[in-house]
């Protein structure tokens, strides 16, 4: 039984990673990609298939079962950290942002949004969390200056 559970978790992890890799590989700024990740279509009331496993005592207490879950979230945090580092290094975000903290914000928002939506049976709770995180990310971006100053006298 445990072997089947491990295989099922590995399949879920692989599917989640594949979907996320595909999204992260799209064209666009780091902000656009991160907000696309936040806003992508999800079955909000069902929740995250990996995140749900962290509420299962059997999974938490069985190293072979929790490992694929842990590995998936570690990978996701790293992938988002790299995305935010790239954005910062390209001048898209303010220079002093902590890319790892932004990655954690995004992951925690999605996971917490699932919990809020499921607890209230209201997808608007998820949407509000996602839009709040997107607004915070927007505040971390460097505004594009389109004004050209005229120095002639």
In which residue ranges do the predicted regions lie?
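Short amphipathic alpha-helical segment with a characteristic S/N-K-E followed by hydrophobic residues
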Residues: 1-5
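Amphipathic alpha-helical packing segments from all-alpha helical-bundle domains
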Residues: 11-18, 63-89, 100-104, 131
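Hydrophobic alpha-helical segments that form the core
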Residues: 97-116, 132-136
